[in-house]
A protein has these predicted regions:
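Glyoxalase I/VOC metalloenzyme domain signal
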Residues: 1-8, 13-33, 50-106, 113-276
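Short acidic/glycine-enriched loop/turn segments that link adjacent beta-strands
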Residues: 40-44, 256-258
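Short beta-strand scaffold segments in enzyme catalytic cores
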Residues: 46-48
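Conserved beta-strand edge residues that scaffold enzyme active sites
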Residues: 40, 108-109
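Conserved catalytic-core motifs of GNAT/GCN5-like acyltransferases
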Residues: 33-39
């Protein structure tokens, strides 16, 4: 069978029902956010747009029960989203590989522009709950990319130009290795100390043990809170470490081995790092 080539569409930080606080936190950390969006599925969000990928800060309106997975999950990094240009083909490939997925689902959100409001339309192929216990994994097919990647939203005080890396912490990384091999084929992953890496376009997903996570991030890492696996950290490319430092130092950031690191407790449960 032909496996899809993994590319990164976006990453998701869950702020549950605290969208105002979540958005303000990420603005203070130097991200330019889009105006608030409201999905037809019931969730709401702000985006930080980069060159070819983006960060989504997502929440559920208080009292709204249409997106229970948002309120049932802890705050923090909760979604890693692959790109696809053909959601039907991706769905067929996942089925053939034995990966439990839902059929493609379509939704939209209005985007208010100077010339008027238009609907951004998406179709996703989501892995079923429990397949990746660390959080949500899915594919996103954009039908209106011009409404999402707009230049006025791609300039950030912290200098971010893209997502370099996402980190998953797992007591047994081999479980994720087996899943990613089923999704993307033999040779999609390679070993690293305490785990493995999946190359995702110009980015990468590292799946590492708690020991390796602690060595790299120390007390800046998220609290495992009894979880065997969880999505832990994001590393962003920046055009200037000084810009990243100026934007984040008020949030408890530190400089460490050529990077700027923001502790999870200052970024709604997700450790953030900035690199050149």
């Amino acid at each position: 069978m032909i496996h899809p080539v993994p590319t990164l569409d976006h990453v998701v930080v869950n702020v549950r029902d605290r969208i105002d606080e979540g958005a303000e936190t990420y603005r203070r950390l130097g991200f330019t956010l889009t105006p608030r969006g409201f999905h037809t599925l019931g969730s709401m969000n702000h985006l930080a747009m980069f060159g070819t990928d983006y960060l989504e800060v997502i929440a559920a309106p208080p009292g709204d029960t249409r997106r229970p997975e948002i309120m049932e999950a802890p705050e923090g990094l909760n979604g890693l989203v692959f790109g696809t240009e053909d959601s039907a083909a991706t769905y067929a490939a996942m089925q053939s590989a034995g990966v439990p997925v839902f059929p493609p689902g379509e939704f939209s959100r209005p985007v208010v522009l100077p010339e008027g409001s238009r609907d951004a339309v998406f179709r996703t192929v989501r892995l079923m709950p429990g397949v990746a216990p660390s959080g949500r994994l899915y594919f996103c097919h954009h039908f209106t990319r011009d409404l999402v990647w707009r230049d006025e939203w791609r300039h950030h005080p912290n200098g971010t130009t893209g997502i370099a890396r996402a980190v998953i912490c797992a007591r047994d990384p081999s479980e994720f290795g087996a899943l990613f091999t089923r999704m993307f084929g033999e040779g999609a992953t390679r070993p690293i100390d305490g785990g493995f890496v999946l190359t995702v376009g110009v980015s990468r997903f590292d799946v590492i043990t708690p020991r390796v996570l602690a060595v790299e991030f120390g007390d800046a890492a998220p609290d495992a809170a009894g979880r065997d696996s969880f999505m832990a950290a994001l590393e962003f490319r920046t055009g200037s470490l000084d810009a990243a430092w100026r934007a984040t130092e008020g949030g408890g950031a530190r400089r460490d081995r050529g990077r700027v690191i923001v502790p999870a407790n200052a970024a709604f449960g997700a450790t953030l790092a900035f690199c050149l």
